[in-house]
């Protein structure tokens, strides 16, 4: 019996951080190990170029780092197909066919695109590739006939746009070639949108407010000890706030069930007064090191042979291209574009 297909991936614009880990990577590994799905995981370098077109080297260099992060967290090339988007030219051809099914006005109404255009400050100079990348995402998803796409809740409009394209294509050509995907969204919204160490809503390289999977133990310690807490909690005996306190936010996200009572007790003591920030940060450091230490060690081991890392990705890309090629052939057949025997 054919397994349901999952497609997921990341833009390779730098090393991945713990926001990526709790928001998607950890769940991908769980889904992989269930062995109920055929999983495709891709490095979306073409999508990253939509706002890094003049700095492609950043993307190229990031491919290796993101691949290391994938392997370190437990994604296994023998269980999941890991590939590079630009190595699958069939995706670009699918995008071209789908563009004829989507109006410019519809693209401009996409809430996710509108938000990202505002955040990136494009003004009137919006790259065409950026505006149409929801169509490229639809090509990525449909090329592998993905049944499920794990994404953050902010990506719901993208999934809906893909579903619209699938319906438009199948209706226009009276076929059922394309599969309508469903989004898989984080159950823990706090994990799905992990804020930065400084309390900023976004953890990012540009803001220098993230913990990266590649960070060594000393770097992790320094970052945790510098985290934003309650600025009015000056003395240990002062009552403190846990709302907006990044240490407690991270404890809620990374704590395991067996940690729940200790975390609850710490919250009560902190709010009452009598618990200092240094102690809460040290406790968080223990919990993070428990989670990230093994990942760090695996990453170091994989990094010793980057040739083998790229070999794994090449094999995955070859398999992905075979699958995408079959879908493209079916799409062209439905459109009547097979001219020769």
From Swiss-Prot:
GO terms for molecular function: ATP binding; tryptophan-tRNA ligase activity. L-tryptophan binds at residue 140. Pfam families: tRNA-synt_1b. GO terms for cellular component: cytosol. Gene3D superfamilies: HUPs, Tyrosyl-Transfer RNA Synthetase. ATP binds at residues 11-13, 19-20, 152-154, 194, 202-206. GO terms for biological process: tryptophanyl-tRNA aminoacylation. Its EC number is 6.1.1.2. A motif ('HIGH' region) lies at residues 12-20. CDD domains: TrpRS_core. It catalyses: tRNA(Trp) + L-tryptophan + ATP = L-tryptophyl-tRNA(Trp) + AMP + diphosphate + H(+). It comes from the Bacteria. InterPro entries: aa-tRNA-synth_I_CS, aa-tRNA-synth_Ic, Rossmann-like_a/b/a_fold, Trp-tRNA-ligase, Trp-tRNA-ligase_bac-type, Trp-tRNA_synthetase. Keywords: Aminoacyl-tRNA synthetase, ATP-binding, Cytoplasm, Ligase, Nucleotide-binding, Protein biosynthesis. It is found in: Cytoplasm. A motif ('KMSKS' region) lies at residues 202-206. It is an enzyme of class 6 (ligase). Belongs to the class-I aminoacyl-tRNA synthetase family. Homodimer. Catalyzes the attachment of tryptophan to tRNA(Trp). This is Tryptophan--tRNA ligase. The gene is trpS.
